Amino acid sequence: MRVGVLGAKGKVGATMVSAVESAADLTLSAEVDAGDPLSTLTETNTEAVIDFTHPDVVMGNLEFLIFNGIHAVVGTTGFTAERVEQVQSWLAKKPSTAVLIAPNFAIGAVLSMHFAKQAAPFFDSAEIIELHHPQKADAPSGTATRTAKLIAEAREGLAPNPDATSTSLPGARGADVDGIPVHAVRLAGLVAHQEVLFGTQGETLTIRHDSLDRTSFVPGVLLAVRRVRERPGLTIGIEPLLNLQ
């Protein structure tokens, strides 16, 4: 398969360039970064693209890719419900094209979200702390937002988090994502980390994942690239590829 990388000069993008070059069954067809024309992808007969760019440009990238029939594996964050609906609308006009958007491609991170969903109904309280490098554009992270939504779904019909806080500074209790408090840390020296904290009478449970290097994303991204065209339309997350439903 001929694979292009968008955001090829970024830290994650450069890692993906090396990963594609090292994969015996993939051919690196294009390296595209800010200022380079997207037409490079069509001129090089690129079949699938890995996008690790920026929330400000990812929608324009996807519109181009979908209408040119190029499959996309997207690690760029910042996808609101409205953006997802727009992508689905574009894909409806190109039913054979596939887009996979994942908040996290690290296998351990995906498993931690799955474990959190399983644990959620058994605890009274749940909160999330996500920790990233200070260059990250969005807060809370896509992984934390998705984790919170999964926890909220698993706790549907149960009592909300107990919390007697009556006065606080703005933001002190974190962002509220479907009733789950999410706290974002931006600190030099970090890459990507998340803790999910559960509590109930007499015990707590912490599920933590740490990406210590951006190569942690490579196995998940390459899995998605190899299988994206099997799933025309929109796929959210790599859970279906890991049989985690």
UniProtKB/Swiss-Prot annotation:
Keywords associated with the record: Amino-acid biosynthesis, Cytoplasm, Diaminopimelate biosynthesis, Lysine biosynthesis, NAD, NADP, Oxidoreductase
Superkingdom field: Bacteria
Catalyzed reactions: (S)-2,3,4,5-tetrahydrodipicolinate + NAD(+) + H2O = (2S,4S)-4-hydroxy-2,3,4,5-tetrahydrodipicolinate + NADH + H(+); (S)-2,3,4,5-tetrahydrodipicolinate + NADP(+) + H2O = (2S,4S)-4-hydroxy-2,3,4,5-tetrahydrodipicolinate + NADPH + H(+)
UniProt key word Oxidoreductase: yes
Compartments where located: Cytoplasm
Keyword Secreted on entry: no
Record: residues binding NAD(+): 7-12, 75-77, 102-105
Residues noted as binding (S)-2,3,4,5-tetrahydrodipicolinate in the record, renumbered to the chain: 133, 142-143
Disulfide pairings: none
Listed SUPFAM superfamilies: Glyceraldehyde-3-phosphate dehydrogenase-like, C-terminal domain (SSF55347), NAD(P)-binding Rossmann-fold domains (SSF51735)
GO terms under cellular component: cytosol
GO biological process: diaminopimelate biosynthetic process; lysine biosynthetic process via diaminopimelate
Family note: Belongs to the DapB family.
PANTHER family per record: 4-HYDROXY-TETRAHYDRODIPICOLINATE REDUCTASE 1, CHLOROPLASTIC-RELATED (PTHR20836:SF0), DIHYDRODIPICOLINATE REDUCTASE (PTHR20836)
Protein purpose: Catalyzes the conversion of 4-hydroxy-tetrahydrodipicolinate (HTPA) to tetrahydrodipicolinate.
Protein name: 4-hydroxy-tetrahydrodipicolinate reductase
Organism annotation: Mycobacterium ulcerans (strain Agy99)
Gene: dapB
